[in-house]
Curated annotation (Swiss-Prot):
Pfam families: LRR_1, LRR_14, LRR_8. InterPro entries: Leu-rich_rpt, Leu-rich_rpt_typical-subtyp, LRR_dom_sf, LRR_R13L4/SHOC2-like, RLP23-like. Keywords: Cell membrane, Glycoprotein, Leucine-rich repeat, Membrane, Receptor, Repeat, Signal, Transmembrane, Transmembrane helix. LRR repeats lie at residues 96-120, 122-144, 145-170, 172-192, 193-218, 220-241, 242-265, 266-291, 293-314, 315-338, 340-363, 364-387, 388-407, 408-434, 436-456, 457-481, 483-504, 505-529, 532-556, 601-625, 626-649, 650-673, 675-698. It is a single-pass type I membrane protein. This is Receptor like protein 27. Residues 762-808 are cytoplasmic. It comes from the Eukaryota. The gene is RLP27. It comes from Arabidopsis thaliana (Mouse-ear cress).
Amino acid sequence: MLFFIKVFMKTILSVLLLFFIFASSFTLVVGLAGCRPDQIQALTQFKNEFDSSDCNQTDYFNGVQCDNKTGVVTKLQLPSGCLHGSMKPNSSLFGLQHLRYLNLSNNNFTSASLPSGFGNLNRLEVLYLSSNGFLGQVPSSFSNLSQLNILDLSHNELTGSFPFVQNLTKLSILVLSYNHFSGTIPSSLLTLPFLSSLDLRENYLTGSIEAPNSSTSSRLEFMYLGNNHFEGQILEPISKLINLKHLDLSFLKTSYPIDLNLFSSFKSLVRLVLSGNSLLATSITSDSKIPLNLENLVLLSCGLIEFPTILKNLTKLEHIDLSNNKIKGKVPEWFWNLPRLRRVNLFNNLFTDLEGSEEVLVNSSVRLLDLAYNHFRGPFPKPPLSINLLSAWNNSFTGNIPLETCNRSSLAILDLSYNNLTGPIPRCLSDFQESLIVVNLRKNNLEGSLPDIFSDGALLRTLDVGYNQLTGKLPRSLLNCSMLRFVSVDHNKIKDTFPFWLKALPDLQALTLRSNKFHGPISPPDRGPLAFPKLRILEISDNNFTGSLPPNYFVNWEASSLQMNEDGRIYMGDYNNPYYIYEDTVDLQYKGLFMEQGKVLTSYATIDFSGNKLEGQIPESIGLLKALIALNLSNNAFTGHIPLSLANVTELESLDLSRNQLSGTIPNGLKTLSFLAYISVAHNQLIGEIPQGTQITGQSKSSFEGNAGLCGLPLQGSCFAPPTPQPKEEDEDEEVLNWKAVVIGYWPGLLLGLIMAHVIASFKPKWLVKIVGPEKRKEDNPVRLFMTLDSRWDSFNNKKNVEQKSDM
């Protein structure tokens, strides 16, 4: 009976503690009901050590597991990005000494060293601490974690060596990649009896490695050593690890070529990565020996000049990457007959043609085909029936887009940009719009109108048909593409009005209409805000748009009103799979230059209305677009003042307001824009002093020319220099006569004065010495005195003028 009372009281205490801890959030965390009160308190204290406002109570404690019998915390897995701040050396986390599983990866810990307190958690079997920004060496206390099976410290800033692993005898997976570890690999590492996976990529490791004496004693199956600084004969000991299934030796920086025959004994090897290494030429022929079970072979940037015939023997090959080499000529016909070939990357070589019948490619099993950046010419080949991704940009293909492309119902990405294709865009592209995500036909010679073919449920996210000869109007069926993010039809002959109707697309981020025949107003009929929900790039330059912009035009541009996204890794059109990355490209007139911008950040915001016939005042609401990087309103007919609110656009790097009819002064607040690298207000009607800030005075004079009333650097030194008097032409004759009279009266007096001075200097009469005194200072020269008074009078007048202007 006493036992049941104790259990009951223990449960009551746990529930009461839960109530008091979480009453303010009105959230019942059921998962903690089996945890002891002291354990719940430790978890709560750990949470309170950080700013955890990005996650709610439920998210935080969903990753907690407690032992059903003892109530101690055995598992803690926090959601990514939940914690902000630095981890204390005496954190309450280290009091949870019964933890067996701990995952704190991808949080926002302030850069600091790894606390040695982790060594107190000696029951840990799994520890994930990747992507947290930890600095310095791994504490020696980590050698106490003798029960560890999995240790992941990848994607941090850790340094030094890692001798602590020699005591981790139960370790099966060790991930230390993407750090700054240096020195040699400990000799004891490969002798760990249970080690099956080792990832040391992207460090500064040197020397060689020492493999176990007996090849059967190593259980190592996955080994990743790429991007280090090994100098010695590292391949010889690796060749003894015959149980390997995955091996990455990319960019080893060794001084000798790699012989593929070294891997002939790897009967289980299915993935081999040798990118960035020189290969022994004789080892890539069909006579060489290579593991026949290979499914994935990556030979990127290996300096190859001939197609490796060793591939003939790899009947199980699924993925081959030969990109960034110098292979020339034709792709051999036998290559497409490899029965399990799925992914082929031939990017950036010197290929000119495909050998054999086009049916060989059509009937192949290839799903991902990258032929981009080669010298292919002639008609574009019919793609494989099984194709998912087809990239052939930057070649010299000619003729029409094959209609057979439309029969590839699983095609998701089609990129045929930068070729010489002609004819219309096939209407049959609608046949696979339920799979099509990207259509990029940029910079060809395509004609006709853009097909109005999109129906409900279309998955299209990117449509880029810029730099063609397209006519007609924008297809209204684009409204059915609810996932559309990027639309570029620039440099065509499309004749239409501004597509206000595209505001209905909830995810549209970039709209480029540059250099077409668009016309009419760009203000909504109700004169309200334009208000695209997520639009960040709006390029409509060099059209025939007219009218004025209402004061609230830039209100409710939600995406562009936000501050810059600090995550610089996210790009528009970043539709990637493990083997291919597609990124949108946009042409920008930026910092006075016209450039093609690849890898456009989702946080990037730019507006270009230049080269139209827009008039009226520039709306003050432009200052709401805090994420704006570039603003170009040049070559229009804008009037009025430059908006003072531009000083609020703190991310602005490029501002072009040239060739308008703007008046007034340049706002002084522009000099506070610390990122402003380019500004042009040339050829307006501006007056007054140019703001004297480093970002502005460092600009070229041409950025301010054509404004008669502007002064100050970089045009001239000061706006307040005294004017130089210019004689009037009608007074010149009179002045000449006056000077003649002065000279005639001057010379006799001058001659008499010189004679008297000579007498005084020679004889020094005592009466003169008594009057003047031998040490009495000389009086000011009357001419110099007059010039001094005149200078002070000018200074007084200048000061008075400045005060009057400042009062105005």
